[in-house]
Amino acid sequence: MKNNYTSLKSPIDEEDELKTGHEIDLEKGLLPEYDSEEEGALPPYSDHARVSNPPNTHRENHSSGTTDDSSPFLIKLLISFTPIVLLNALAVWYLKYKDAFFKNYGAAEWTLFGFWCLVCTLVLIILTYFYETWTKAVKVTVIFLAQCIKVTAVFLAQCVKGLFNIRREMMIIIWILWLIICCILFGCVKDGRLNFNKALICSTCTISAVLFLIVSSVCIPIWTLWRALSGMLQVLGIHGIIAVLVNGSMSLFGKHFGWRGYEIEGFVLFFTSNALFLYEMERPGVLKRMRNTTGNVIGYICGGIEDAFRRIKNAFRGANDNNNIPLGEMDVEGEV
């Protein structure tokens, strides 16, 4: 095959090459002369020279330092000895707890102690010999446990977020469970299986209110906590009114009740509190509307009574005015 290579050099450049005998590199300057008869002599800018004399690397610049990355033997031995120390510390603590640390040792105990020392020595040798293997296993285990903890934390965070999203349903479920538990307790008290005193039975509503406060602080955001607290205070106020009415009824008709007074009071207060709570959760603000409605009804009744008294007063005033009219004026009015 013919070489179709065409030189891009101008005739002037070719004449300069013939005069100098070689090309001139503008960056490196003129090439020094070398003896081609010497063995292995190569021009300093040739490709073979670059390959045979590579540039200095970071490793060569720091050739004075060590290149062995493996841990020294003493460090391996110390790290391998650490788990054995921890294991023996647990054994010593257990013997101290049982008050049997080097006390009343016989032949069997000393034989067991020697066997334990032999096992610890063999374990130390094995851990030192397989240092890289078990350290890698420990690293992998630690990374795996860290990932498990991370996944668990993310899962719990999602669960908490879900609780905030369904806080009303969760609170109703928790409250119904508490209702069932308290009903079981009341039944056990009635059957005589449990001996609760009067304070515990009467404090059932207080326990329910505390549970409501705890659940509210956990499941309700802080900006709606005030509404929950106000609702709880309203429920407790209604509790007090009902308690007064129940105590008054028991004082009047105490002989007709088969149960003791504090049992009736506990039942009434407990079921009333649960009914009001569920009603408030299903329709937020119902207690406030109930209070406003009650106030309006009372105001309407009082206004009606006031109007009735005013009309009666006006009627009496009109009658008095008619009685005070003179007889002459009455005759004039009659003629007109």
UniProtKB/Swiss-Prot annotation:
Lineage start: Eukaryota, Fungi, Dikarya, Ascomycota, Taphrinomycotina
This chain's function reads: Acts as a suppressor component of the dual wtf meiotic drive system, and can suppress but not confer meiotic drive by compatible poisons. Wtf meiotic drive systems promote unequal transmission of alleles from the parental zygote to progeny spores by encoding a poison and an antidote from the same locus; the poison is trans-acting and forms toxic aggregates in all spores within an ascus, wherease the antidote is spore-specific and targets aggregates for degradation by the vacuole.
Which InterPro entries does the UniProt record give? WTF
Q: Which UniProt keywords apply?
A: Membrane, Transmembrane, Transmembrane helix, Vacuole
Instruction: Report residue spans for region: Disordered.
Output: 1-21, 35-68
- Protein name per Swiss-Prot or TrEMBL: Meiotic drive suppressor wtf23
What Gene Ontology biological process does one annotation of this record name? meiotic drive
Please give the subunit comment from the record. Answer: Homomer. Interacts with other proteins that exhibit high sequence similarity.
Question: What are the cysteine partners in each disulfide bond?
Answer: none
Query: What gene does this protein come from?
Result: wtf23
Report the domain of life of the source organism: Eukaryota
**Protein's membrane topology:** Multi-pass membrane protein
| An example Gene Ontology CC term for this record | vacuolar membrane
Cell location = Spore membrane; Vacuole membrane
Q: Where are the transmembrane segments?
A: 73-93, 110-130, 140-160, 169-189, 206-226, 228-248, 261-281
